[in-house]
Amino acid sequence: MLFRSALWQYTQDLKNQFLRNAPPINKVMYDNKIHVLKNALGLHTAVSRVQGGKLKAKAEIRVATVFRNAPEPFLRMIVVHELAHLKEKEHNKAFYQLCCHMEPQYHQLEFDTRLWLTQLSLGQDKI
């Protein structure tokens, strides 16, 4: 179970290990408004604002709150996915290659995570 500050540090550690040249992340948080079965598992946003005549971009990563109690490999898969969007905006071949570079078991973990979420939706909370 990672709390907000631990989630930020966890994400920063992965970013520093694999994406040192990517833009900085300004905010990482759990978001209870993300409905994981109908929509996304996490969200990434780039917010642009004008400050003092300059355009400033801020990157944010939001992870569905359900992952606060998820097995760590499932959380890692979500964080890797959202970090990959810092470099690749679309879900294309380069995006998935980057995900697999950061987490070699990415595809298996994505599959297992979706099975776990389906199990939760059926009211079964044991893995």
Question: Which residues are covered by each model-predicted region?
Answer:
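Active-site-proximal or metal-binding-adjacent scaffold patches in catalytic folds
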Residues: 1-76, 86-127
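Walker B catalytic acidic pair
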Residues: 82
